Design a protein with these regions (language model features):
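Acidic, serine/threonine/proline- and glycine-enriched intrinsically disordered segments
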Residues: 1-117
């Protein structure tokens, strides 16, 4: 099923036939148990690593692996982080790498990146 982009409010707009798959509700349930809220004591890198680990259960294919992370990502947020995501411009994220970049820009700033090295 193809969605009409002009009616979509999601910041994620990946136009690739390989991205057109449904998520099993059990995966959504898993990520909703420990959501990322955007607080100072949370790790953006750790959150993305958890999503990546979960995606390895979904597929061995690298492309589908990254698409799974992008598809499950909105369900993994709560509180301020969910508000930030929902208030992002519709269609502004057009790839899994773009999603990671936007998320890290917000929750894993350059100063924290340098400290992690």
């Amino acid at each position: 099923m193809t969605r009409d982009a002009k009616f979509s409010t999601s910041p994620i707009s990946i136009r690739d036939k390989d991205y057109d798959f449904s998520l099993d509700l059990s995966y959504i349930s898993i990520v909703e148990r420990e959501p990322f809220c955007g607080t100072e004591n949370e790790s953006a890198m750790g959150h993305m690593n958890e999503l990546s680990s979960l995606s390895s259960l979904f597929s061995d294919d690298d492309k589908k692996h990254t698409y799974f992370v992008a598809k499950i990502f909105p369900f993994s947020l709560k509180g301020e982080a969910k508000s930030w995501f929902n208030n992002s411009s519709p269609g502004s994220i057009d790839s899994p790498i773009g999603l990671v970049n936007v998320f890290f820009r917000k929750y894993f700033p350059a100063s924290a990146q340098h400290a992690a090295l």
